[in-house]
Amino acid sequence: MVLDSQRGKADFALTPVAKKLINVNPNMISWIGLILAFLSGLLFYLSYDGTYLLLVGAAVVLISGYFDALDGKVAKLAGKASRKGDYLDHVFDRYADIFMIGGVAISSWCNPYLGMLALVGVLLTSYMGTQAQAVGAPRLYAGLLGRADRVILSTIFPIIQYVGVVLGYPTLDIGDLSIYWMEIMMIWFAVVGNLTAIQRGIITWKNLSKESE
């Protein structure tokens, strides 16, 4: 999935709300998104003993993602877009990733080693994109695991896990191997996240090589 490349198509859901919040400090909206991301991670961590929290956590992830997109739209419409705001947004995004993915990683839904690999994949994906910009190459959103993709997957898989528990199929069984549905999401983050990081690294290297020719 490459939902980050489709960001412009979400304007219909952002612009009307952004216009109503045009007098609100965009940084305040960023803080709300970060707090919601922390809450979602906490809900996922606690959800093994209360599976309904999976649904609540999924909803909170979606709302957090909405606020994450809304702050930039408000800043743009209000003429308050700045490098400081962009920097704060990137920092908060990384903390949000850690909160949301970390909540699953340390929960009983996930093998801790898999959780660690998923976090590495997610953080390296974002790092390789911003590091490209830091060295003077174009900022990269390329790959199969952008921020928007993570938000959508972190909304869908908790719902799948909840439905699986209710129907009596909490795991995907392959022979003697049983994997929670939430772990499938984490496997995707671990594998595709690191592949996306490598892909972005290769693209940046090629871009920098062209500049040096």
Q: Whereabouts are the PLM-identified features?
A:
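Basic, amphipathic juxtamembrane/active-site segments
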Residues: 72-114
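Hydrophobic alpha-helical transmembrane segments
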Residues: 1-62, 100-213
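Active-site His/Glu-centered metal-binding helix of metallohydrolases
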Residues: 66-74, 87-95, 124-127, 131, ...
